[in-house]
């Protein structure tokens, strides 16, 4: 029997390991068997990077607000743009107003394609699942929780600075409350990846099988 596509958000603060967890879940044969189908992953940030490079109207609107982010060739300086956004809440809010509608449409397109191919579970990775409006289009969400010290160590280990971590972490201070507000299931990500995969898989199985017989 064909089962409907289930769309679940995967959120968490910076350096919480969202992408690593998503990749492990996509590769988990045990999860596929438990929910009765394939698992795929879409990253909102990746979709946004594509949109910034291909959507001229979006790029022009962004540059109107942050003109110093324009490179000599007319493209966006993403690093400078991110620095401005994390340093100035007004810039962050304006960017989100411009970008999230584009991301929601892109994820809707990905979702339709996945459903047409018979995918069982689509993991939607995004930090701002609540205020982006994405949560309203999902069947549930997971909140990956990792101690701040661990996240800082991970961020620095992959080449970031401690100061940059503090700026980005502070800018995301409201994320946990937003995720709680949309009913996200908390997942402890402070342990090993296999432990986190197990906990997330259990939660995903419950979300996928809601309203269905588990016999």
Name the predicted role of every residue range.
Residues 10:
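Hydrophobic anchor at the beta1->P-loop junction of P-loop NTPases
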Residues 13:
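P-loop (Walker A) phosphate-binding loop of NTP-binding proteins
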Residues 16:
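ATP-binding Walker
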Residues 19:
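Walker A/P-loop
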Residues 46-119:
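ATP-dependent small-molecule kinase phosphotransfer cores
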Residues 107, 131-137, 156-215:
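Small-molecule kinase domains that catalyze NTP-dependent phosphoryl transfer to phosphate-bearing small molecules
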Residues 108-116, 121-157:
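ATP-dependent NMP and nucleoside kinases share a basic, alpha-helical "lid"
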């Amino acid at each position: 029997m064909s089962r409907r596509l289930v769309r679940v958000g995967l959120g968490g603060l910076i350096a919480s390991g969202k992408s690593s967890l998503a990749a492990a879940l996509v590769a988990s044969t045990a999860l596929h068997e438990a929910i009765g189908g394939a698992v795929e992953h879409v990253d909102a940030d990746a979709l946004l990077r594509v949109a910034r490079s291909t959507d001229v109207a979006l790029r022009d609107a962004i540059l109107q607000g942050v003109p110093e982010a324009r490179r000599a060739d007319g493209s966006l300086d993403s690093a400078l743009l991110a620095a401005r956004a994390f340093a100035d809440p007004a810039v962050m809010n304006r960017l989100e107003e411009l970008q999230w509608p584009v991301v929601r449409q892109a994820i809707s397109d990905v979702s339709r394609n996945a459903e047409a191919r018979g995918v069982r579970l689509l993991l939607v990775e995004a930090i701002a699942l609540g205020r982006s409006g994405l949560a309203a289009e999902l069947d549930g969400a997971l909140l990956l929780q990792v101690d701040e010290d661990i996240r800082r160590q991970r961020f620095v280990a992959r080449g970031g600075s401690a100061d940059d971590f503090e700026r980005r972490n502070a800018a995301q201070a409201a994320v946990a409350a937003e995720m709680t507000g949309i009913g996200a299931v908390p997942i402890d990500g402070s342990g090993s990846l296999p432990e986190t995969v197990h906990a997330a898989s259990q939660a995903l199985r419950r979300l996928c099988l809601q309203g269905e017989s588990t016999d």
